[in-house]
Amino acid sequence: MERFLENAMYASRWLLAPVYFGLSLALLALSIKFFQEIIHVLPNIFAIAEADLVLTLLSLIDMALVGGLLVMVMFSGYENFVSQLDISDDKEKLSWLGKMDSTSLKSKVAASIVAISSIHLLRVFMDAKNVPDNKLMWYVIIHLTFVLSAFVMGYLDKLTRDKK
């Protein structure tokens, strides 16, 4: 009975495979939105105000960061929790594949979230005259919470590594 339960639990990791595949569909949706934004801006490039162009560019940067985060979570999560990726040697391979454990993934995700939050905060500040002060305050508080969380996670990981 114990062996059956252990085998069933170990096999259940494959339930995550469709989740990681779903993230690739989310990446496709993000790519469609990215190019939709570019197609929307290009015809108006000579008429658009500089501030509006910068806001659009920040949105594109934000989408690129989210896309990178999706790729990182997809591949690392799959490799850490489901199965090792078997990519032939003749294909281009990401240098970090197979080298990112759950601790380093957590740190990279936290850093990505801080970067994404920074872009959002910059977009909000560029349009600060149209944003109520209390909302600005909450944006800053939330961003600082992300920064503090990433710092604490990194510090705790460093303490854990130093004890080994």
UniProtKB/Swiss-Prot annotation:
Keywords: Cell membrane, Membrane, Transmembrane, Transmembrane helix. It is found in: Cell membrane. It is a multi-pass membrane protein. GO terms for cellular component: plasma membrane. The chain crosses the membrane at residues 15-35, 53-73, 136-156. Its main location: membrane. It holds the Pfam family UPF0114. The keyword Lipoprotein does not apply. It comes from the Bacteria. Belongs to the UPF0114 family. This is UPF0114 protein Spro_2386. It comes from Serratia proteamaculans (strain 568).
